Regions:
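Hydrophobic beta-strand-centered segment that forms part of the acyl-chain substrate-binding groove
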Residues: 40-79, 103-113
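HotDog/MaoC-like acyl-thioester-processing domains
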Residues: 1-3, 70-74, 81-122
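Short, hydrophobic/aromatic-enriched beta-strand segments in well-ordered soluble domains
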Residues: 9, 79-82
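Short, low-complexity, polar/charged sequence segments that are solvent-exposed and flexible
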Residues: 14-15, 24-29, 53-55, 77-78, ...
């Protein structure tokens, strides 16, 4: 908690997005990859004692890199490291891998509303 988080998703041809992205060349949409990295990132903060049941909101996703397609039958492994967490704002470096090869990465910023409410923002 508070340092890093990781997880994976086994993808099969029955995933709804493979039917439409793209017919004849099914692969996981980039924005769903970023969504998965964002959700994994949030776990680093939401597992800190006192944050159970809280939610985080996406502030930004930058430095997006998509290197390879993620196809049916892949295990999409995600890892996220907390770069900073101050005043309710968290910054993460996240990456996705398939077969130990980097397939995507991003710098993600999330906000924890219960924390940021106590600071006056102009």
């Amino acid at each position: 908690p508070g340092k890093s988080s990781e997880g994976y998703k086994d993808l099969n041809l029955k995933e709804w997005f493979f039917k439409v992205h793209w017919p004849g060349d099914p692969n996981m949409p980039g924005m769903l990859q970023i969504e998965a990295l964002t959700q994994i990132s949030s776990l680093s903060i939401l597992t800190i004692p006192g944050n159970k049941g809280e939610i985080m909101y996406l502030v930004s996703a930058n430095d997006l890199v998509f290197k390879k397609k993620i196809i049916p039958g892949s295990r999409f492994f995600m890892k996220s490291d907390v770069i900073s967490f101050k005043r309710g704002l968290a910054t993460f470096k996240a990456k996705g891998m398939v077969n130990d090869e980097l397939v995507c990465s991003a710098t993600i910023k999330l906000v924890l509303p219960k924390e940021i409410k106590q600071y006056k923002i102009i």
